[in-house]
Amino acid sequence: MLKMEVVLFTFLVLFPLSTLQLETDQPVERYVENKQDLNPDESRNFMLPIVKKCCTACRMPPCKCCA
């Protein structure tokens, strides 16, 4: 009878807990994948027309981002 209780406890309690832990890890992995797809140059060029300021990366007058 004790063996049956151990098997039931394993499949009814421990197995669902381990699967729930795996499901909570997936959104973090998706966020990391999405974050890696971002290109810093594209995001800078996207924001410059909105802010309408010259960037601080280049201080020379004939730069591409300030023109």
UniProtKB/Swiss-Prot annotation:
Give start-end of the signal peptide. Answer: 1-24
Which cysteines are cross-linked by disulfides? C54-C65, C55-C63, C58-C66
Q: Which domain of life is it from?
A: Eukaryota
Tissues expressing this chain: Expressed by the venom duct.
The entry's propeptide annotation covers 25-51
Query: Entry's InterPro entries?
Result: Conotoxin (IPR004214)
Q: Which GO terms describe its molecular function?
A: ion channel inhibitor activity; toxin activity
* Cell location: Secreted
One cellular component term from this protein's GO annotations in UniProt = extracellular region
Q: Which UniProt keywords apply?
A: Cleavage on pair of basic residues, Disulfide bond, Neurotoxin, Secreted, Signal, Toxin
For domains, the record's comment is: The cysteine framework is III (CC-C-C-CC). Classified in the M-1 branch, since 1 residue stands between the fourth and the fifth cysteine residues.
Q: Which family does it belong to?
A: Belongs to the conotoxin M superfamily.
Query: Would you tell me the protein name for this molecule?
Result: Conotoxin ArMLKM-01
- Provenance organism: Conus arenatus (Sand-dusted cone)
